[in-house]
């Protein structure tokens, strides 16, 4: 790698090597460090392999020149480290100066082997391995170099401590340390003025220099554990152990900031040993710190050896405390510090307080001196008074307990054992201090004893800590967070405790580890999953026998309630009897509960003392749309033996608000809208659903009950996790959670995340983790989604075959009949006028999007005001605001809507649009536009005009009357008459997305003496169920009129076998849902689906668009035909023929 600088920013560029399959695999490019810079320069440097992970290719390299240094260092990262979300694998000295003109001194190779590796004849690539022997040599050299650097660093650190202690005590030039009775170690201090002067001249300038550098940086960083290779002097080499230590690779290393002004006494002691860690797996040139003991140095006896101490990753909250130890070694700062100039990305800063630096050793020593006598640490040399010690220990204890309260210890690799030991040690020290008030006097008597004795003894004697005691439950974070929310906890001042960005390296590793564990757990649970042929017996008390696929589903449901998380998603196709399957589950668990009721000795679930839920119920809470609340009640009453299940409808103004009463019922049924009104949804950042409800939340009765299970019917109603309904549902408490929906994914994978959040499927109920680990568009994310769906979701379709090759459900035949119609001459003339206007509006909109045709002085064409004026209404003329500049997207979509209405009936052009219909179209109108739309239905009737002028063309006014038969209405009536004359008793269902169109059809049905009933949004749930029952009865009405939105879900209209779709919608799943109202379990007759399409109109284009959307939706989730409801510009061009 050569030094290539960006011509724009002047910074040294990174060397990027392609590792993924594609045209750039194996090729290398120089790229600028700045993300927004587009500088790229190709190079012919060959592919390299990582020194730490030999089987992986190095994909990123970078040159960094540490501040006040003349030796460049080359940082490298391989594909494995990048996949783990870390920054660098490590770094090596760059032996040859990449820019000799800029640097006055060229770094020379220190060993012949290294110079051979980087000879000028080879490419400038320190990782290139030509054969196996050379690779082994280079790795060995990398390891040995790290050992020399670590030993060098330890010696300088301890010498610096010795010098600072001498300064504090002002020792004589010739002095000896007395052997302490409580220690077996005898340490001698070097004597002689020459030796002392030599040490002072060696260490003092470096200390001052490092302090100055840290203060200049403001937030200077310290790199510890990075292998480096300066020459060691004779005096330094004396402290190097004879036998080199092997390089230890940690699985993770903390990215530790130094928080300004924080108490350095929060440093976590490591039992007096030195932990030496090399840089691994991409911990960046950032402030990585390995913890060291304070008093390991050349003063120890020869029998003592340097040995590393295994160290578990600490919680993010511990970072700030450990960071201060980085300032105790100024030599590290000088040798390893990387310049924090603005041109160096990947680096973050931390402030070093010079006063903290001076007092750090003393405060850290006091931590070990304050341990109780049982720890084997002598307190003789402690000159501080007991009050100061007590205050010091109390402060540390509060910090540790605060950390414990904020961290989910179960997510830590050591399960929080280290933190618990520290808390126990601090509590013991406080107890010992309270029992020995005369300790301060003893300390004063021995104040003249050299302080180094205590330091040495404290470091040499390992701490014997009392085993951790069990913690009270309220201190433990709920298990659903799994440490992820704790990883983003912030200090009271609002500053993040872990620098390096919102997702720092330790948190990224935590995310990766927890995700892997959760996926592995789900994968292991599949081993106990019942097979496709496994069935469960019909529960006692069920009046009707279950079909085979329902018995198989029941076996799966019972299995899921024994797994974690308890519950899942039942996503069977619409019409396969999901309601009866869930009723069978409730009845089965009810029977099991009766048989085990006497044996149960423990509560159903654990409740904390701060939890407002005081009633544990064995019942089931069912949440459904208001249109289905009576449907559920009727299904239970019809399918289950009387008095088996007690049902309560939590709905209406007279509902019971006593949680204790509700907890006694077997089934409580309520609606989504009622939940959203009753349950407060003010959600704070990082709040766990259902944990510690707010004060106002205690007034909601449904929150005061812990249910045996919650069932969300039509669960796609909570597909948006940010809406009030979704948040309220997630706050409910239950042992098992079920989502029942025929379309688990309607728009995108965010719909699936909403269900994961409701199921509390940790850790995938955390949005940031969901986006980074599942919904990231990668192959690995797709694999994780596949594991989730296999474990948590059961879906069968009507056309699915069982193991024997037979259909899963025996349903009658279904055929679709497409009626192609031609508009009459008058209808075609009106349609063409609207088409020309719509096409012009879209073209001008496209020009504005492209930046070519922005006409600021011209108001856009408002279709509502234009049509209102043409039908004789002058009200819109009094609303100049309606003609002001509006978003063109609204106008284009509204023009498209009017075009589709032209194909159905021209009278729809005069009627106002229902707000729910506008919402389904994706239209959000301003108040002026809504008022303008209302004027369409208020035509002046006092002076009726015989003609209507549209764009200069006059048409007869009777053409727009609702009493006139349009082409589509005429074809519909002809089909209905043919059905009435056909064999047997056949009924029809007519579906339209516009209630105004249903009113026009009803008018003509009445003229033809056909009985009908209408279900739309204005019909209350009780009347709706009565109409459904009447229609399914043989003596009921012949025709049922339903709106696409209000009647598209949850209705069982098996009494009819003909379904007419009057208009086309680009959301095909809405139409499929409507078709499933008649084509479902219980249908005995052959089903015919009638579609009307007017030739040469926008409806033909919509039909093509529907097929495209269906093909895309099938690729999202197997069997899930979820739509994409938004129209793109490409779609609009197709619809308007542009």
From Swiss-Prot:
Its main location: cytoplasm. The keyword ATP-binding applies. Residues 135-182, 192-202, 267-280 have a biased composition (Basic and acidic residues). Its EC number is 3.6.4.-. The keyword Lipid metabolism does not apply. Pfam families: Helicase_C, SNF2-rel_dom, Zn_ribbon_GRF. CDD domains: DEXHc_TTF2, SF2_C_SNF. It is found in: Cytoplasm; Nucleus. Keywords: ATP-binding, Cytoplasm, DNA-binding, Helicase, Hydrolase, Metal-binding, mRNA processing, mRNA splicing, Nucleotide-binding, Nucleus, Phosphoprotein, Spliceosome, Transcription, Transcription regulation, Transcription termination, Zinc, Zinc-finger. One of its GO terms (biological process) is RNA splicing. A motif (DEAH box) lies at residues 713-716. One of its GO terms (cellular component) is spliceosomal complex. Residues 90-396, 846-866 are annotated as: Disordered. Residues 971-1133 form the Helicase C-terminal domain. Residues 104-124, 351-369 have a biased composition (Polar residues). One of its GO terms (molecular function) is hydrolase activity. The modification Phosphoserine is found at residues 436, 859, 884. It is an enzyme of class 3 (hydrolase). Zn(2+) binds at residues 6, 9, 32, 37. ATP binds at residues 572-579. A zinc finger (GRF-type) spans 6-46. Residues 559-762 form the Helicase ATP-binding domain. DsDNA-dependent ATPase which acts as a transcription termination factor by coupling ATP hydrolysis with removal of RNA polymerase II from the DNA template. May contribute to mitotic transcription repression. May also be involved in pre-mRNA splicing. Interacts with CDC5L. Part of the spliceosome. Belongs to the SNF2/RAD54 helicase family. This is Transcription termination factor 2. It comes from Mus musculus (Mouse).
């Amino acid at each position: 790698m050569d030094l290539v600088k960006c011509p724009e920013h002047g910074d040294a560029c990174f060397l990027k090597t392609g590792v993924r399959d594609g045209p750039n695999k194996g090729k290398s490019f120089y790229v600028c460090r700045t993300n927004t810079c587009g500088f790229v320069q190709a190079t012919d440097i060959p592919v390299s392999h990582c020194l730490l992970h030999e089987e992986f290719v190095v994909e990123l390299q970078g040159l960094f020149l540490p501040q006040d240094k003349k030796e460049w260092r080359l940082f490298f990262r391989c594909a494995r480290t990048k996949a783990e979300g870390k920054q660098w694998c490590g770094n090596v000295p760059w032996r040859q100066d990449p820019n000799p003109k800029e640097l006055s001194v060229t770094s020379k190779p220190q060993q012949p082997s290294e110079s051979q590796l980087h000879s000028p004849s080879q490419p400038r690539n320190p990782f290139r391995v030509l054969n196996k022997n050379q690779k082994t040599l280079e790795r060995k050299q990398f390891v040995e170099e790290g050992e020399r650097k670590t030993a060098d660093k330890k010696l300088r650190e301890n010498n610096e401590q010795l010098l600072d202690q001498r300064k504090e005590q002002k020792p004589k030039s010739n002095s000896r340390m007395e052997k302490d009775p409580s220690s077996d170690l005898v340490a001698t201090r070097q004597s002689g003025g020459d030796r002392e002067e030599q040490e002072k001249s060696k260490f003092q300038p470096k200390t001052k220099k490092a302090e100055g550098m840290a203060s200049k940086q403001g937030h200077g960083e310290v790199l510890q554990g990075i292998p480096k290779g300066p020459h060691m002097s004779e005096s330094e080499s004396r402290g190097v152990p004879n036998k080199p230590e092997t390089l230890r690779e940690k699985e993770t290393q903390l990215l530790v900031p130094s928080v300004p002004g924080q108490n350095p006494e929060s440093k976590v002691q490591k039992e007096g040993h030195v932990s030496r860690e090399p840089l691994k797996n991409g911990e960046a040139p950032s402030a990585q710190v390995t913890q060291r003991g304070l008093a390991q140095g050349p003063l120890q006896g020869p029998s003592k050896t340097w040995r590393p101490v295994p160290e578990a990753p600490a919680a993010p909250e511990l970072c700030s405390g450990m960071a201060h130890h980085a300032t105790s070694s100024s030599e590290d700062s000088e040798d390893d510090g990387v310049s924090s100039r603005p041109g160096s990305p990947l680096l973050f800063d931390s402030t070093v307080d010079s006063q903290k630096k001076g007092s750090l050793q003393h405060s850290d020593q006091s931590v070990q001196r304050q341990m109780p006598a049982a720890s084997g640490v002598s307190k003789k040399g402690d000159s501080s008074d007991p009050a100061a010690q007590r205050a010091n220990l109390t402060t540390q204890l509060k910090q540790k307990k605060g950390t414990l309260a904020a961290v989910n210890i179960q997510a830590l690799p050591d399960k929080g054992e280290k933190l618990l030991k520290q808390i126990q040690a601090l509590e013991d020290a406080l107890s010992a201090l309270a029992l020995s008030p005369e300790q301060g006097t003893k300390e004063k008597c021995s104040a003249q004893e050299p302080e180094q004795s205590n330091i040495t003894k404290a470091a040499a004697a390992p701490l014997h800590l009392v085993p951790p005691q069990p913690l009270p439950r309220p201190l433990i974070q709920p298990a659903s967070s799994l440490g992820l929310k704790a990883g983003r906890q912030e200090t009271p001042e609002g500053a993040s405790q872990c620098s390096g960005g919102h997702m720092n390296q330790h948190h990224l590793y935590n995310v990766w580890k927890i995700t892997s564990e959760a996926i592995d757990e789900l994968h292991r649970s599949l081993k106990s999953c019942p097979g496709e042929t496994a069935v469960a017996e019909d529960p006692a008390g069920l009046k009707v026998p279950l079909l085979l696929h329902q018995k198989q589903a029941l076996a799966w449901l019972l299995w899921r309630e024994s797994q974690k998380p308890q519950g899942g998603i039942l996503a069977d196709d619409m019409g396969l009897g999901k309601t009866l399957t869930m009723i069978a589950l409730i009845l089965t668990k009810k029977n099991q509960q009766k048989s085990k009721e006497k044996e149960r000795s423990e509560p159903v679930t654990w409740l904390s003392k701060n939890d407002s839920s005081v009633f544990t119920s064995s019942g089931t809470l069912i949440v459904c749309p208001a249109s289905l609340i009576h449907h559920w009640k009727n299904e239970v009453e019809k399918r289950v033996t009387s008095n088996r299940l007690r049902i309560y409808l939590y709905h209406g103004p007279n509902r019971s608000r006593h949680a204790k009463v509700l907890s006694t019922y077997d089934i409580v049924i309520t609606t989504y809208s009622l939940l959203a009104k009753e349950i407060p949804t003010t959600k704070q950042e990082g709040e766990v659903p259902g944990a510690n409800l707010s004060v106002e939340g205690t007034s909601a009765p449904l929150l005061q009950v812990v249910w045996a299970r919650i069932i969300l019917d039509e669960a796609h109603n909570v597909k948006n996790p940010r809406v009030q309904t979704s948040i309220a549902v997630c706050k409910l408490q239950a042992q098992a959670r079920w989502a029942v929906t025929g379309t688990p994914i309607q728009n995108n994978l965010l719909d699936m995340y909403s269900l994961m959040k409701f199921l509390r499927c940790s850790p995938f109920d955390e949005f940031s983790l969901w986006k980074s680990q599942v919904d990231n568009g990668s192959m690995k994310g797709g694999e994780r989604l596949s594991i989730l769906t296999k474990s948590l979701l059961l879906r069968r379709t009507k056309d699915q075959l069982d193991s024997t090759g037979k259909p899963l459900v025996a349903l009658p035949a279904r055929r679709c009949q497409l009626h192609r119609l031609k508009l009459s001459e008058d209808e075609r003339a009106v349609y063409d006028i609207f088409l020309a206007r719509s096409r012009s509006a879209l073209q001008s909109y496209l020009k504005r999007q492209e930046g070519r045709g922005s006409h600021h002085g011209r108001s856009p064409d408002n279709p509502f005001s234009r049509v209102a004026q043409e039908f004789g209404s002058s009200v819109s003329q009094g609303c100049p605001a309606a003609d002001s500049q509006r978003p063109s997207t609204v106008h284009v979509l509204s023009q498209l809507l009017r075009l589709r209405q032209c194909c159905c009936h021209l009278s729809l052009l005069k009627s106002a649009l229902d707000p729910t219909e506008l919402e389904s179209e994706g239209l959000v109108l301003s108040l002026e536009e809504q008022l303008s739309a209302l004027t369409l239905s208020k035509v002046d009737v006092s002076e009726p005009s015989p003609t209507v002028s549209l764009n200069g063309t006059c048409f007869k006014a009777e053409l727009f009357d609702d009493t006139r038969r349009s082409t589509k209405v005429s074809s519909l009536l002809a089909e209905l008459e043919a059905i009435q004359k056909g064999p047997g008793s056949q009924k029809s269902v007519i579906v339209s997305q516009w209630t105004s169109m249903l009113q026009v059809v009803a008018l003509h049905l009445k003229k033809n003496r056909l009985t009908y009933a209408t279900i739309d949004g204005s019909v209350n749930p009780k009347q709706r169920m009565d109409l459904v029952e009447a229609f399914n009865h043989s003596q009921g009405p012949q025709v049922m009129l339903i709106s696409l939105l209000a009647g598209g879900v949850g209705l069982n209209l098996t009494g009819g076998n003909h379904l007419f779709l009057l208009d086309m919608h680009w959301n095909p799943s809405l139409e499929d849902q409507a078709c499933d109202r008649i084509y479902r379990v219980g249908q005995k007759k052959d089903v015919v689906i009638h579609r009307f399409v007017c030739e040469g109109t926008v409806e033909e284009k919509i039909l093509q668009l529907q097929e495209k959307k269906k093909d895309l939706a099938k690729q999202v989730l197997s069997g899930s035909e979820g739509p994409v409801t938004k129209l793109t510009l490409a779609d609009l061009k197709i619809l308007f023929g542009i």
